[in-house]
Amino acid sequence: MVKRGKKTKYLFVTGGVVSSLGKGLSAASIGALLENRGLEVQHLKLDPYINVDPGTMSPFQHGEVFVTDDGAETDLDLGHYERFTSAKMTRRNNYTTGRIYQNVIQRERRGEYLGKTVQVIPHITDEIKAVIREAAGGADILIVEVGGTVGDIESLPFLEAIRQMKYDVGEENAVYAHLTLVPFIAAAGELKTKPTQHSVKELREIGIQPDLLLCRSDREIPRDMKDKIALFCNVDPSAVFTALDVPSIYEVPLSLHREGLDDKLAELFNIWSRAPRLERWETIVDKVKNPRRGEVRIGIVGKYVELHESYKSLNEALVHGGIANDARVKLAFIDSTKLEEGDLSDLEKVDAILVPGGFGIRGTEGKILGVKYAREHKVPFFGICLGLQMAVIEMARNVLGLAGANSLEFDEQTPHPVVTLMEGQKGVTDKGGTMRLGAYPCALKEGTKARALYGADLVHERHRHRFEFNNDYRAQFEAAGMVFSGVNPDLGLVEMIELPGQHFVGCQFHPEFRSKPFAPHPLFAGFVKAALEHRDAQQRQPPAEVKKLAVGKNG
């Protein structure tokens, strides 16, 4: 066991050949293995893009924005780190080129460089090394994932900085792991190592000799091929590992352990640690692969359905809900813009309906139709952030009779702004980092479904929004049966809603950011449980005829 007071050791994870190989999952899985050996692990993601953070980037370009407790908008890989380990991510666990340059330029403006010419080397690289050391926070191991692909011009300052780190901290305190692709060429009937050889060659030209290679492949790489890779890449044969495609991401730590990766890391770092205790990972994988209660279909009604990375934490939180109920969750992505054409047949095929967060008016009328279908057919419903607001608008129009009810985000002239801009957001013009972000308290009402699911009176959840329920309409909604089950105790802001007599729950926050495979979030566990009960009830009766609901202008 590494004792406190010893130097932090650094594992640098780079990627080559193609993007989206799974560096984030590999880094998270390594963190899980090392943590299960009794080591304290922290993570850092370095992103080469010039945006200060991903908060203003399109989900189609970047995927999900993961929000931390301290209100940072970060890369989705931080979600993997939190789900796979006990480490808590903060804004210091994700840096971009833009943020690094911003720090350096601010120092230059303050005159901290004493009249020197500010350059990429040493000033930018020194700043990168400083944030690496800060992220360690006294942990035994800091795993640093460098985004992008080796060879990208944007990555060069980060690669130069991590090259220097080995000389700053010593050979035994820095290890380089390189993730590459070993593709199987069907026409030739064999695996090809040349892409890996060229990727490592490019990395070595930068001055980094990888200590170990993770070779992504859809099949086991034979020993003789690993020896060939080792020979051409100047790596010890025992340091070439198959990063095998597996059915569940929660099987990746077990797969890498079977390859002996964590033992090799202990050897390279020259540390002693206990054998990893992976029984709970084995249990999770068994529950994912062999659910006793079968399959349940959850319909996700959104507009980013073509890119599942847009809802990464949400998708995983639903899987966790399935684990909690010993069921397999099958996700059905339903394009809300297509629902606006009037055909709701896709909604009939699912056991529960979820409307996730989002921004912008496109697809909102389809989401409202999804809410209406769930309410009228008593299909379990879960609305998150914008999903809660869609539920409020749907009920205002179709139950309270408030024609034209809407959110001020979508219609500034609406006669009934049941969703309004938060007081603290009025006058805010900048887009980046200015929303209500991070963890805030939510007081739960006694006797409600929310209180029963959480088993607590007060919870803290992560937020990312500018708009809120308009409390001027609260009495009308309560008279119509809506229960405001969660409220911010400081501002009186509505955090949770529900309807009695069915599983119809909405929350203004993002509970998916706090769910883990070993600790499924109670709202997702309860939602999947309700979906299973609805599935079982539907199987006992003949299917109802699908209704087509007309789409009107704003209602």
UniProtKB/Swiss-Prot annotation:
Pathway: Pyrimidine metabolism; CTP biosynthesis via de novo pathway; CTP from UDP: step 2/2. L-glutamine binds at G358, L386, G387, L388, Q389, E409, R466. CDD domains: CTPS_N, GATase1_CTP_Synthase. It catalyses: UTP + L-glutamine + ATP + H2O = CTP + L-glutamate + ADP + phosphate + 2 H(+); L-glutamine + H2O = L-glutamate + NH4(+); UTP + NH4(+) + ATP = CTP + ADP + phosphate + 2 H(+). Residues 535-555 are annotated as: Disordered. Keywords: ATP-binding, Glutamine amidotransferase, Ligase, Magnesium, Metal-binding, Nucleotide-binding, Pyrimidine biosynthesis. GO terms for molecular function: ATP binding; CTP synthase activity; glutaminase activity; identical protein binding; metal ion binding. Homotetramer. This is CTP synthase. It comes from Anaeromyxobacter dehalogenans (strain 2CP-1 / ATCC BAA-258).
